[in-house]
Amino acid sequence: MKNIRNFSIIAHIDHGKSTLADRFIQYCGGLDLREMSTQVLDSMDIEKERGITIKAQTAALNYKARDGQVYQLNLIDTPGHVDFSYEVSRSLSACEGALLVVDASQGVEAQTVANCYTAIDLGVEVVPVLNKIDLPAADPERVEQEIEDIIGIDAVGAVQCSAKSGIGVEDVLEEIVAKIPAPTGDENAPLQAVIVDSWFDNYVGVVMLIRVKNGTIKLKDKVRFMSTKAETQVEQLGVFTPKSVQKQELKAGEVGFLITGVKELGQAKVGDTVTLVANPATEPLPGFQEVQSQVFAGLYPVESHDYEALRDALEKLQLNDASLKFEPEVSQALGFGFRCGFLGLLHLEIVQERLEREFDMDLITTAPTVVYEVVLKSGEKIEVENPSKLPDIGSIETILEPIITATILVPQEYVGNVMTLCNQKRGVQVNMQYMGRQVMLTYDLPMNEVVMDFFDKLKSTSRGYASLDYHFKEFQPSDLIKLDIMVNGEKVDALSLIVHRQSAVHKGRELASKMRELIPRQMFDIAVQAAIGSRIIARENVKALRKNVLAKCYGGDITRKKKLLEKQKAGKRRMKQVGNVEIPQSAFLAILQVSDK
C-alpha cells in the first residue's frame, strides 16, 4: 500500500489538464501509440469539443521511479467547471493529493481557486505545477507569486512542465511520488468504499468507479449501498489503465471499477458508501449529499409525436447523469414536453446539445428559471420553479428567491465594469481583495439574475478575463412579480417570467418590441402585449399581409386550385398556432436577450 499514490488534477478550463493526463498515460505505457488519441480520458465528443471534462475518468498507471521502486499512480480526472462542483468534491475526497495545474501564461482563475479550496478543506495535499512553460508569454515567477497570494500555498520551485511538448513530465511524476502521501486504511476492517462516479454501459449495466478506504472487496461478494440500502452481488472488478483490466479483488487504498447487477444509476449515487452485507461497516463515509437542481427549463419536441422519443432520450441521458431531473409538463403554447432540472447553465447547454446530437431531437427550450419559495397568506410554503405555476397575487404573502455567493477574479483594469454589472443585477458587495494584478470580488447575487445572461455579460465587460465561481447561500424575501406576454389577447404560458418589480416595466417593453420583430406577419393584425396581473404595461402591433397562391391560375380546374391551397396549408403544419399565431423558436429565446436597465 505504501507504493500507491491516489491523485487528481485541479485546473481551470484550457489550462492543460487533459493533455497532461495524456502524457502520464503515454509515459507510463498505459496505452501504446496507436491507441493514443488526444484527450484519452475525455470520452464524450462534447467533452473534447468544448475542451471540458464532465464525468470523472480514471487511469491506474505503473511508474518506475528514479529510486528504482515501482509505484501505482491512480489518476482520477476531475471536472473543472463550476456546475459540476459536487463531482469535483467527490473526486477529490477519493484522493490523498491533487496537482494544481496552472497555465504559466494566464495565471490563477476563479474555478481553480474554488476547487483548490475544496481540496484544502478535504485535507488533500496540493502540489502546484506550472504548465505551458514553452509559450512565449509564460511568466513562471509571476504565476508562482499569484498562487501564493491568492491560494496561500507555497509555490516557490513549483514543477515546470509543458504537457504538449512533453518537457518536464517526468519531474511532475517524481513530484507526485515525493509529495503526495500514501493512502491510509485497514485491509482487514469492514469494507468502506466510496462511489466516485458511475455511468451506464449498454452491456453490463451500471459501472461504478470506487475508491476503497477500508477493507477488501472480492468477486462474488454481496454488497450493500448505505444510502439506499439496496443489496447486490459483485460481478466484475478491475482497474482502468485507461483500458479496463479485470482483477480478483480491490484492497484498501486502491481505485478501480465495480460492476454489479444494478441497472439504474439512481441506486449507485455518487458519494455513497459501499459495504459488505456479511460484515457491514457501522458508519458511511462522510460527505454524501443528494444533488439539488438549481436551474429549470422546459424542453419540448418540435414535432409533438416525438414526445415519447424525447422521454426515451432523457431517460438514457439520466442513466449517465444522475443530476438530471425531469417530469412531464403540458404547455398550452407548446403542447407536451418536460420540465427539467439542471445543476447550472452549462449543464443545461450540454444536455440540450447531447439530445440534439446523440438522439437527433429537434427541441424548443423555454427560458431557464430558478426555484422560488412562496409563502401563502394561509401560512403554507410552496416551491415554484415554473412562472406559469405561480399562484394568484392575492393569495401570496411573500416570495423568497435563491441568493448565491459569487467569487469573481478579474484584472484590475476591468473592476469598475464588473462592479457596475453586479449592481445592475441587484448584487450586494461582500468583499474585495487586491492580489497582485488580480482583484477578487465577492458578491451576493440573486440566482434569477445569474441564470439569464450574467456569464456572457461578465465575459464581455471584462474582455474574457474575468472568471466566476458561485455556490448557493440562502433564500431571501424579495419584491417579485409575474410578467405575462399576451398574443392576440391570449397568454402564452411558455413566455411568462418572474421579475423584480423595479425592472418589470422595462423588461415588458423590451420583450413586447422583441416579439414584434420575431413573430412572422399573418393574414390579420396581431397585438402583442406585456401584462402584470391585469395591468397592460406595453403593446406592439404586427401588421397583416396576405400571399395569394392562386394568382397564377387563370380559370382551369378546381382541383388544381385545391392542390395549391392544400400545399399552402401543409406549409403551416409545423408552426405552433397560438390563438392562430405562429410563434417561432427564436421568440422563446428572445427572453434571454432582454437587457436590464
From Swiss-Prot:
| All residue ranges annotated as the tr-type G domain in the record | 2-184
Q: Single GO molecular-function term?
A: translation elongation factor activity
Write out the residues that bind GTP. 14-19, 131-134
Where does the protein end up? Cell inner membrane
**Gene Ontology cellular-component annotations:** plasma membrane
EC number(s) of the enzyme?
3.6.5.n1
**Please, one GO biological process term?**
positive regulation of translation
As its record notes, the protein acts as a catalyst of: GTP + H2O = GDP + phosphate + H(+)
Top-level lineage group: Bacteria
Keyword hit for Membrane: yes
Q: What is its main location?
A: membrane
Keyword list (alphabetical) reads: Cell inner membrane, Cell membrane, GTP-binding, Hydrolase, Membrane, Nucleotide-binding, Protein biosynthesis
- Family matches, as InterPro entries: EF-4, EFG_III/V, EFG_V-like, EFTu-like_2, G_TR_CS, LepA_C_sf, LepA_CTD, LepA_IV
Q: Which family does it belong to?
A: Belongs to the TRAFAC class translation factor GTPase superfamily. Classic translation factor GTPase family. LepA subfamily.
Q: HAMAP family per the record?
A: LepA
Q: Which PANTHER family match?
A: TRANSLATION FACTOR GUF1 HOMOLOG, CHLOROPLASTIC, TRANSLATION FACTOR GUF1-RELATED
Q: What does this protein do?
A: Required for accurate and efficient protein synthesis under certain stress conditions. May act as a fidelity factor of the translation reaction, by catalyzing a one-codon backward translocation of tRNAs on improperly translocated ribosomes. Back-translocation proceeds from a post-translocation (POST) complex to a pre-translocation (PRE) complex, thus giving elongation factor G a second chance to translocate the tRNAs correctly. Binds to ribosomes in a GTP-dependent manner.
Write down what this protein is called. Answer: Elongation factor 4
Origin organism is: Neisseria gonorrhoeae (strain ATCC 700825 / FA 1090)
Q: What lineage does UniProt assign to this protein's organism?
A: Bacteria, Pseudomonadati, Pseudomonadota, Betaproteobacteria, Neisseriales
